[in-house]
Curated annotation (Swiss-Prot):
This is Pre-mRNA-splicing factor spp2. It comes from Aspergillus fumigatus (strain ATCC MYA-4609 / CBS 101355 / FGSC A1100 / Af293) (Neosartorya fumigata). One of its GO terms (molecular function) is nucleic acid binding. It is found in: Nucleus. Associated with the spliceosome.
Amino acid sequence: MSSSESPKDGKPSSKPFSLSLSGSGSNGRSRKSAFNIPPARAAEPPSRTLARRPHRLHDDESDEEEAPPAFEDVAGFDTHTGTVLSADGRAVDKEKRELVIPVTSKNNWRDRVRANRGTRGKNLLPKEVQAMQEAERRGETAENDQETDRPSMSYGLSFAKPSQGEETKPGEDQAMKDAGPLKPQVVDERKPLTQDEIALQALIRESKGETEGRTDLVIESAKREVDESYPVRLDETGSFRVDVASRPEPATLDQYNAIPVEEFGAALLRGMGWKEGQSIGRGKYGTSATDYRSQSPRIPERRPGFLGIGAKDVSGGKGAEAELGAWGRAAMRKGARKAETQGGEGNTQGVYMPVLMRNKKTGEYITEEELTALKKEGKAKKGDDDWRERRDRNLEKSGRMDILVAETITTMTAIGLTDGGRVLHGETEVCHPVIDSPGGESTTMKTAAGETTVIIATEIETETGAIVSGIKIETGIGIERGVVTGAADIGMMIGIARDIHPLMRLAGTDVIETAIETLNGEDMMINVSENAGQCFGLDRT
């Protein structure tokens, strides 16, 4: 131990009193501790030109000796940053300390409201039992424990026990007890009033101006015994006084300046148990049960459409709208299971409400499932049924079955051969089915410019009627290998053309002629309505 240097020129030294201790540790190295006491009053800041030499009790000559401890003069603390300031004004602690404002729970307004509501009921147990319970809570044993006599319970066959009085021998007189004095029977002096007396009293009260009947009956209220466990009810004035009395002392100006404005909210949250990295406003901080929820951010979900304020989405899906009438959870689960078994989406929830459709012709009501089944059956039958049978059936319905008996076209003129096929041109009132030409040649039907054009359509058969979608072939559109090309409406010629609508006369056009070609081995049925003017048909001629 050494003291500071002697004062020079009559001035006290600014170097503080220091104490250094050293000892051997477990690893062979010396451990040192230094205590530094700053001077009570420094006249001037110490000079940095002279090197400081630490003072120790003894020196250790080991090569692995740690560096001597550095002495720091602490002059105070920074109220803004919370760091330690040395005697020369430098900050010793570089790291910034976290500010925490603890929140005390002494002034809890919920406890006062709960006391006023009287949620805690009165203890109805006997006082002896309450005293025993209180002694057990304090860890004491209740004195003068008395066993209460209770009737013994026996099960099975039981026999009556003989009386324990004095046994009398046969032939002796038995002692008889004298009967006590008779107690007089209490008789109610009040007699019930007769109807005449009641009417007389009513007249007397009416003459005195008493409109309401009075009675001398008294209902006594049960007097409430003083119970310390019962909370004291507080009114607004008492609650305000308790609130003011339980408030902490106001903060000083230095404490107010020590906390920066931008860290005030975080300091309050740290006092409530919040830590860095946790989300704000969800769960209880520091608990293991809500640790995951506290760390995960809360993302607000978008409300479903047409959902009113305060209403809840009963469907359960994200953004799903509840169907009107779907109020029961059991019905929703039933609808979801039914939708999953029928091949639909399993997450569909809601009450199953089938939509009925009415056929205009037959008046029959069918559901969507039945309509889907009928469409599937129609598609299956369409592939199996022969087109000739459908042709005969349609012609029989329209009354034009006799058209097929014609053998030749009314007028048919051979214009020439194109690509080895037969080019035919003519005018007729009926159009016969196109059959493969003799010799396996392709057939081509040409229409001169300004004469006629052909509209070909396909027919889809249903149980309720025919749905026709047309393909229009105009002048200047070529048909190559059964495929319409160069037109806005493209359709397939390969197969069966079920219907040909009335021909339309073309206006003046620059196109010379158009051709409709039927390849070898293909069949085309041409059916003309009553308003048909001119059309063209190909036959085996």
